[in-house]
Amino acid sequence: MKKLLLLALSVIFVVNADAQWSEAERAAGYVVFERDDLLALKRTDVPGRDAVVSKVTSTLARDEYESVQLGVLAIGGGLEQVKATVESDLAVQIYHRIDPALKSRLGDVAVFGDQGVIYNWVPANVHLQRGDLVGTISAGDNVSLWLTIHAPADAEPGLHSGKIRIEPAGKPATVLDLEINVRPFRLQRPRAAFGMWMREDMMPEWLGGRSMPQETLLAVYQDMADHGHNSNWFYPMGRYDQLPPVKCHSLERLIPLAQQAGLVDPKIPVLMAGGVPGDRKGRAVYEAIAWFEAETRRRGLPEFIVFGPDEPHYPGDADVVHRALSPLRGTSLRTNLDQSNMAGVYGYMTPGLCDVHTIHDGSVTPEVLAEAERMGSSIWAYSYRVWRENFDPLPQRYFAGLYTWTYKLGGNWVWAYNFGHHRHAWFMPDSHEPMPITGMEGRREGIDDYRYLQMLEDCVAAYPDHAESANVTAWLDSLRNRLVGAMPNKVTAGAPLAPAEFDQIREKAAEYIGKFGAIADASDRWPRSTHTKEEAAYRGRPVQDCIAGLKASDVASRRAAAWALYEYGPDAAPAALALGKVLADPDVRMPALHALEKIGPDAAPAVPEIAKLVHHPDPYVRIGAALVLGEIGAPVQEYTRTGRRKASPHAALVVEPLIVSLKDEFEINSHTAASILGSIGAPAKPAVPIAIGYLDRHHELSAAGLGILTDLGPHAAAAVPKLLAFGKGDLADTRVVEALAAIGPAAAAAIPALTARASSQTGAAQAAAVYALFCIRNEPGDLQRLVDSLLGPDADKREIVERLQQLGARAKTVVAQIRPLLQSEDFSDVHEGLQTFLGHVEAGEVPGVFYEW
């Protein structure tokens, strides 16, 4: 519970009407003020008069940490050697904003490498440096002092009084009263898995990678545990081609240290990757799993969940995902997928495939949760961006705590403990001592928010007839309804909660807990380990039986019938109309969408019913509808990340609803619709004005707009003026050059700018401009220039060969110059690409340029 700060009540004489500081404060040369610990304190921030404090109070439960953020503002002149001390019978760790000279020194990538560097664009106020002495505060600047209080499990409840003393060299000291109230209960352990990804080889090089001292690794794990985490990602695991496995780095080294640090909880699952029992084949898979589970039971370890392909695209990575996870289907090991966008959430939530879906922040929705419950799947959340939003701790606290609680998630993870600018800890040069960022401290606050609300819900469950149970239930329901739909990376001070409301919620929860009486961990409320259901009751039965099953009286049968039709794929085409009719049934809707998607173009009779769902209030349902429409109008030809769609005879049917999806407020849905529309060709021309408008929007939408215009090619001719304006004259964005090339002769207005770029640039940029010129004006000289560049001494060979591949048969006149290169060692690194080009020429193919979605 954050401190309540009492303002100084003394009457202050102000020198003049415009000055806010008293003569005494000016004489001292500084003031000490409070800043909410959910908000970043920038070096140049100047506090208001009402922020100056004389007393700091903080309230926390036993075995809880709580932070206080103070600021010291230099007024008049600068300050030197500012010393902070705390007198308290409770432990208080003092941090200050990272020293500017140290921050500047750590900005040298050449010296400290990608994992040790602190990039210059990351603000200093993010990094907390352990220590009680600040060297210098320039006149008009401030420094933040971050005090982290810890009440041990055996702390005496009640008031603990102390002092905070701030004293710059040669200046009078400022002494603040410190009052810490310890609540008479200890919070329960969280029942959700709170973790972050950490790999030894992603830490600063001076720590030693996988050879770092055990003391260092133990300190890292202890830091995670002290910040509220109870789970971890273990990598690498080992090799299971013999039992017991050899070189099992995680079992032999990492896990014992994590146990020693108190990071892992036997009841909370952890993740494993990089050599798992499922890597073997056939019967050996079961033998390896049996050995592994016996070993983890013997050692009292938690459940290990297999970490599947990371952030897979859908549908492009479908084959990769199924190859990776299918060997574990039907085994006792659960599997996990990190889903970076809503398309993947829809695409990989199918029977028996994945048990734990860890979904990127903001993509968890009520319909996702409802479908996961029907399937027996678990939903967790993760983020790699939330701490960077304004660099305030507030989004971190919200994401870890209230977001996890609102959606009743099984886990909450962040990338990463330390990885480039995705870090939650940092290290001083040559030091092995981790130090936190403010977001890490905020994350711990969020985990504690979750623990308070979890404990209160347990009180109601234990005492349903208590006089306060109805009031508590109503309050919790109201709070949850208020928070549903808030995007974690978009939360700000005041939306959906003001900073003060976080502590008001916690205070109210604690007050209610006091009325019930604190209860210990509720053993019957720990989450059960469940696998995603197979829902196979109709598997293999005739299509007509499955169609009849769609009308069964029980939900399980209707769902099983739809999933059986999904497994039939195109052979289930006779069921298209029947599947369309059940899309109105929320319990069967998602299996029916999957079945229609697998049927493909022959599901066209269901388009009117599918089209209704692009207006659904939940983006999970909307993305499913858009992807099904895509398979009907422009089915995927190859399940790879570069796999293309090809328009079907039914393409025109899906354009209108996909344009609705293109306007979807959920940006990944808009992006997905754009990628489909671009494949449809002329019928999708009505999307061009929207795509043109998107060029003026932020990155995600401008990328979608460029994608449509590129893939529609000549059908997007109306976009040429806007593309030239978007390219800002010099066409430095290669994506714009490619869009103009795809449009072709209708982009003649771009010739002067492209000519200038081809003359002023070298390498890939020059090749793109020359390629575009040839596409637009079809002059042999442009093609020859491309070939001459390839033969030149400084050629970007891969780029030029890729451009020749895109031209295919249009470049047949240079085949005689290209073919001898296959015999040249100087071109051995592009022989495969040259063969591909010649193959296109022989087949009469002109692949063209496609947008990299």
Language model: regions and residue ranges:
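Surface-exposed binding patches on compact interaction domains or structured appendages
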Residues: 20-52, 76-147
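Structural detector for internal amphipathic alpha-helices that build alpha-solenoid repeat scaffolds
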Residues: 529-538, 556-571, 589-602, 612, ...
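Amphipathic alpha-helical scaffolding segments comprising HEAT/armadillo-like alpha-solenoid repeats
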Residues: 537-549, 570-583, 602-614, 635-661, ...
